[in-house]
Curated annotation (Swiss-Prot):
Tissue/organ expression: Mainly expressed in brain, with small amounts in heart, liver, kidney and heart.
Name of the protein: Serine/threonine-protein kinase SBK1
Compartments reported by the entry: Cytoplasm
Residues noted as binding ATP in the record, renumbered to the chain: L59, G60, K61, G62, T63, Y64, G65, K66, V67, K82
Catalytic activity as recorded in UniProt: L-seryl-[protein] + ATP = O-phospho-L-seryl-[protein] + ADP + H(+); L-threonyl-[protein] + ATP = O-phospho-L-threonyl-[protein] + ADP + H(+)
Source organism: Rattus norvegicus (Rat)
Record: active site: D174
Gene expressing this chain: Sbk1
Any Gene Ontology CC annotation: cytoplasm
Keyword Transferase tagged: yes
Region annotation Disordered: where it falls in the sequence: 321-405
Length: 417
């Protein structure tokens, strides 16, 4: 069976909106990756691509590929075309990502894909919705964080996205603000994206190359030879770190390992061996601290499900200290761990990607959001009634408020001390 038939069909049969076919959103019907690997992609020359798709602008570019905002000339439908370099990925991994994304597209909190799947001489290509407001990382004011009402709207929708994934025994494995796409800058509508590292629960994978602050401690400690079995707990941990970041504009640590003094201090607090709170956690209320204790439990089996955050969102999460930007030099006396690591925070962290060692898999290139598919409009998800009042008008970081695609260079988020 060939991907790229001329008539539009639901994505579960994997056609491609090639010449003459109007793009339609995927039907959200799962197709086993094993079945997809038997398919052959339709090959399009560069002239075929420009014949049917008008380039609006480039949205992002990275090691693994690029993302272009295009308009389908037949209908004017805008979409994000993701070009993945063949030299950086295997066909089965590309098809796995498309299949998984489509199988989850029935959730209003997960990015949708169009029935556009093809290859060029150098790239594999698929199309997804376009998110005009970029990603969550882009709007977090460093060392300040987002307004709590905005955070609660975002967390509510991400919790529903993760609960939907986990109920289907799928683990995202790369939860971070860069993979949360926005349709407005007040987070009234957000969607989870980038499923290049997603695997089924219980699947054994090799250790990822490198770590980022969202990586769970059991993943950091996994041996390169043995790897580890995928579990929803890694998403729950990353979700907890993400919530800390959006509330504070800082990372809690650089890596969840014993070599990181900030993480070690957190471990001592979690185990009841530290009198008082670590300085960077003092801004949170008691309900928020209980939430973090559950999401960031050191043992994976003790972490609550992602949807457990909902019961904490009815409470205030931060105290008045939340409104004060953190400064490295302002550390309470006697609140440091011994040694030089506690005296200076690491440098600013920029956008990071993870890959699986020796597996040939890769994360998605910079992802960009979805648009209203044709002819069926995408329904706007509405957070739970009464959860969060409307956000105050305007941006909170002093920059001009203008919708745009994802930015490749990151706004720095620093360690809070």
């Amino acid at each position: 069976m060939s991907v790229g038939c001329p008539e539009p069909e639901p994505l579960h049969s994997l056609p491609c909106c090639g010449p003459g076919a109007a793009p339609v959103p995927g039907a959200g019907v799962p197709l086993l990756t094993e079945d997809m690997q038997a398919l052959t992609l339709r090959t399009l020359a560069a002239s075929d691509v420009t014949k049917h798709y008008e380039l609006v602008r480039e949205l992002g570019k990275g090691t693994y590929g690029k993302v272009d905002l295009v308009a389908y000339k037949g209908t004017g439908t805008k979409m994000a075309l993701k070009f993945v370099n063949k030299s950086k990925t295997k066909l089965k991994n590309f098809l796995r990502e498309v299949s998984i994304t489509n199988s989850l597209s029935s959730s209003p909190f997960i990015i949708k894909v169009f029935d556009v799947v093809f290859e060029t001489e150098e790239c594999y290509v698929f199309a997804q919705e376009y998110a005009p407001a970029g990603d969550l990382f882009d709007i977090i004011p460093p060392q300040v964080g987002l307004p709590e009402d905005t955070v609660k709207r975002c967390v509510q929708q991400l919790g529903l996205a993760l609960d939907f994934m986990h109920s289907r025994q799928l683990v995202h494995r790369d939860i971070k603000p860069e993979n949360v796409l926005l349709f407005d800058r007040e987070c009234r509508r957000v969607k989870l994206a980038d499923f290049g590292m997603t695997r089924r629960v219980g699947c054994r994978v090799k250790r990822v190359s490198g770590t980022i602050p969202y990586t769970a401690p059991e993943v950091c400690q996994a041996g390169r030879a043995d790897g580890f079995a995928v579990d929803t707990g890694v998403d729950v941990w990353a979700f907890g770190v993400l919530i800390f970041c959006v509330l504070t504009g800082n990372f809690p640590w650089e890596a969840a390992s014993g070599a990181d003094a900030f993480f070690e201090e957190f471990v001592r607090w979690q185990r009841g061996r530290l009198p008082g709170l670590p300085s960077q956690w003092r801004r949170f209320t008691e309900p928020a601290l209980r939430m973090f204790q559950r999401l960031l439990a050191l043992e994976p089996e003790r972490r609550g499900p992602a949807k457990e955050v909902f019961r904490f969102l009815k409470h205030e999460l931060t105290s008045e200290l939340r409104r004060r930007p953190s400064h490295r030099a302002r550390k309470p006396p006697g609140d440091r761990l011994p040694g030089p690591l506690r005296l200076e925070a690491p440098g600013p962290l920029k956008r990071t990607v993870l890959t699986e060692s020796g597996s040939g898999s890769r994360p998605s290139p910079p992802s960009v959001g979805p648009v209203v598919p044709v002819p069926v409009p995408v329904p706007v998800p509405v957070p739970e009634a009464g959860l969060a009042p409307p956000a105050p008008p305007g941006r909170t970081d002093g920059r001009a408020d203008k919708s745009k695609g994802q930015v490749v260079l990151a706004t720095a988020i620093e360690i809070c001390v």
